[in-house]
Structure formats: C-alpha cells, structure tokens
Amino acid sequence: MFVVGATNPAIRMLGPVYGKDSGFTQLEIGIFLSLALIGGVAAQIPIGYLADRFDRRKVLITLSFLSIICSATLIIVSGDNFYIFSIFVFLFSFFALPLFSIAAAHANDFSEKEFFVDLAVSLIFVYGVSAILCTVIVSSLFEIFGSGVLFIYIGIVHLILCVFGAYRMTIRPTVEDKKPYLAFPRTSFVFLKMFKKSKSD
C-alpha cells in the first residue's frame, strides 16, 4: 500500500508541472490528467475479475511490471508524440490505479472480519502518509534532475513492488478460498441484505 501511495498520487499532484515542462498545451495537460484517471476507472471490473480468480500477489506483480513498461515508454515518447503519450498514460492508469483495491483485498484475505474496519483505516493512513511523502520526494527530485524524472521515479518504485511481491510469495502461501467477483451498484442496506439472501438461495 505504501508503494501505491508513493506512485499514483505523483501524477495527479505533479503531472501539471511535468506537462508544462514537456511543452504540452493547457488542453493537452488536461487530457493527460484526465486519461490518468479514466484508465483506472476502465480497469476496475476486468482487473477485479482477474484478482478474484488468481493469486492477488501475481496480479499485483503483473500489473506493476506492466506499469514499469508503460513508464519506460512514457520516458521515451514524452514531448515527441502526444498521441502515443496519451495512449500509454491511459494504459499506465489502467494497470497502476487498481493496485490500491487489489492490495486492500489481499490484506483482507488474511484478516478476520471483526478487524476489517481497523485494517481499512490503517491502509488509508499508510496510503495518505506515502502520498504526502511522495509529493515532497518527487518535487525535490524535480528541483535536482528536472520534471523528466517523474516516470523514472515511478518505474523504480514499481520495480521495488515487483521484487517485494515476488519475495512475499516465497514465504507465505496464497488464500485458496475466494468468492466470485460480483459487480453491483451501492444501494440501501435493506436491498443489500435481500441481494445477498437471493444469491445464497
């Protein structure tokens, strides 16, 4: 969760600086920041489906690795071809933004039901602290190396996540019993209970 907080907020908070230094117009900066969110929205159901059918750590590592590839591509094409840049911003968002949800689900897999709320609070706290630290760290790197370091930083942090995830897989088994992924809108408590009852029947 710390790694997720140390990467995803960097684009939202310092993306405008990166875009301006890369020579983007104001419209292009707006498109850049929009795509950095749209990809994550588009990924929720398909990535959630995969995370509920495979080891969540494998999904985390795979998505993080794909985020590294997108980051490397964005480093190469930045400022040269905005259309290609936009495609890979969308893809980066598609792979990187669901990491928060999957990491939270993975943590819940090893938690008792009575600790779910405490766990959620802890995860959000860790995410918030890492997001604050990432803003300070990345802005400091901007001062030293320039804004082009943004996706280098993001790629390195995702690499750390890949290595750590692979290490954790060697020392802790996966959770085998998983409920099938089911997408339904948020609604009233009464309807939610009826919905669960109908599914159990």
Name each model feature, range by range.
Residues 140-158:
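A membrane-interface helix-boundary motif in multi-pass transporters
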Residues 43-55, 142-143:
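Helix-to-loop junctions at the C-terminal end of transmembrane segments
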Residues 97-111:
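Intracellular juxtamembrane helix-capping segments at the cytosolic ends
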Residues 26-27, 111-123:
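Loop-to-transmembrane helix entry/capping segments in MFS-fold secondary transporters
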Residues 58-73, 155:
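Structural signature of the two symmetry-related core transmembrane helices
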Residues 32-40, 127:
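Transmembrane alpha-helical segments of major facilitator superfamily
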Residues 5-25, 29:
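Helix-loop boundary and gating motifs at the non-cytosolic
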Residues 168-201:
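Intrinsic disorder in cytosolic terminal tails and internal cytosolic loops
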